[in-house]
Amino acid sequence: MLLGSASTSGRRTFNLLGHPLASVVSTSANSGLPTSDTTFAAVPSRGDLNVGCVVRKALLETLANELPQGTIRYSSKVVRIQNQGCTFKSIHLEDGTYLTTKVLIGCDGVNSVVADHLGFSRPSFVGRSAVRGFVHYEDGHGFDPKLFFFFGRGVRYGIIPCNDHGLYWFLTFSPSPQENNAAEKGIEEDPIKLKQFILSKLGKVPDRFRAVFERTELESMVCAPLRFRHPWELLWGNISKDGVCLAGDALHPMTPDIGQGACAALEESVILARELAQALKTNHSSDSLEKEQRRIENSLEKYARERRWRSVDLVSTAYMVGVMQQSHGAVMNFLRDKIMAKFLVGAQMKKADFDCGTLTASAS
Ligand SMILES: Cc1cc2nc3c(=O)[nH]c(=O)nc-3n(C[C@H](O)[C@H](O)[C@H](O)COP(=O)(O)OP(=O)(O)OC[C@H]3O[C@@H](n4cnc5c(N)ncnc54)[C@H](O)[C@@H]3O)c2cc1C
């Protein structure tokens, strides 16, 4: 599930957004009282920023349906990458197969093998974990189309209507050293324990919100530790090199606090498609392999320049927003609930308002 803005640019438009959401309502988990209600209309945008949930399965199916049959090869884990001369990359799969390619885009998530190949270190654990869940209401859930966020008591959680019948929720928490030793392992392995743990962390929350968590089926929850890439690595690292580049979580694993990880991956797919289409244009078909390779490398370098600062910005903002929204203690509670509430939501929404252009290449 991701929060995103629906773009109406480009030749084809797919409307995958669920219910358009009108505002973000923040509530203190300490007091149970609302601290801000920010409408999306108040966020400066280019006029086509619609916020809503996109169901991951629907997005993947829509993208896959656009490709010729047989383009996607499933269950093909990349285990090693080697340069073959200056032009080709040899990709070794777990089942022993070798593939040869001129371009390799590593979008293999937070444990990216391609990021290893480009010299990035493994993303760091941020000391927080996240649980996600989904609840279906046969007769409708009755919630307004708003994002409901709760902060304080060392947790940060939210409930988001996807449509009239589905609610998505998340909760992030910092395992205490004790929980780390005993309960944390148990939590990931035992959904009953996980649910009890979540219910114990909600704080002062109106009953109708608590009921969402109580109603969640055990198999509809997933829990995972949160990891991110240090921003300085993104400043200095090789986002692209010798026809290989990174996109999505492989490039910028970030905490989920501004809901932009998957949105940024989509931005990258648009920019990459545009740049590579330009580099591989058919009217260059008589060029030598070396010339073509140089064009590919130039296009990936241009892509890397476009994404470097955006990635640094998103990873850093997400981290800072998470620290402020999840921390506790009297001073932090006061600052977050009385002074920063609107600012933090505004920062989140501003990051979503990004124009990555259209798929059509500019005439150059
Ligand atoms: C609690 C939580 C809430 C979130 N909320 C939002 C939100 O509201 N909005 C938003 O935009 N983002 C959100 N995100 C982030 C979002 O889920 C990720 O940024 C997004 O899924 C990244 O997509 P990706 O394709 O880069 O990586 P993934 O989704 O991780 O996909 C990677 C793919 O690569 C494959 N793969 C892995 N290793 C290999 C290998 N060696 N060889 C071949 N294939 C491989 C995997 O099987 C997988 O299919 C949230 C994340 C969390 C944890």
What are these regions (language model features)?
Residues 9, 58, 62, 113, ...:
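Alpha-helical elements of Rossmann-like donor-binding domains used by nucleotide-donor carbohydrate transfer enzymes
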Residues 1-66, 75, 322-325, 332:
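Active-site-adjacent segment of FAD-dependent monooxygenases/related oxidoreductases
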Residues 50, 54, 60-219:
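Conserved FAD-binding catalytic core of PHBH/FMO-like flavoproteins
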Residues 38-46, 176-182, 284, 318-321:
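Short glycine/proline- and charge-enriched loop/turn segments
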Residues 3, 38, 76, 85, ...:
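Short, flexible helix/strand-to-coil boundary loops that buttress conserved ligand/catalytic motifs
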Residues 2-6, 10, 203-223, 284-300:
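Acidic/histidine metal-binding catalytic segments
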Residues 18, 23-32, 211, 258, ...:
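C-terminal helical "tail/cap" subdomain of flavin- and related membrane-associated enzymes
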Residues 106, 131, 220-320:
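Conserved mid-domain beta->alpha element of the FAD-binding
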